[in-house]
UniProtKB/Swiss-Prot annotation:
It comes from Hylocomium splendens. Its main location: plastid. Belongs to the PsbN family. This is Protein PsbN. HAMAP family: PSII_PsbN (MF_00293). Keywords: Chloroplast, Membrane, Plastid, Thylakoid, Transmembrane, Transmembrane helix. May play a role in photosystem I and II biogenesis. The keyword Calcium does not apply.
Length: 43
């Protein structure tokens, strides 16, 4: 394979894995530990 192809595949896999981790953090098990600043400061 050419170097450009390997770099493109690496960058694509990195972006997909980062997006998956961000979605897991936002909506998965760790989301229960996130605080909601709007809920803390009710008017």
């Amino acid at each position: 394979m050419e170097t450009a192809t390997l770099v493109a595949i690496f960058i694509s896999c990195s972006l997909v894995s980062f997006t998956g981790y961000a979605l897991y953090t936002a909506f998965g098990q760790p989301s229960k530990e996130l605080r909601d600043p709007f809920e803390e400061h009710e008017d």
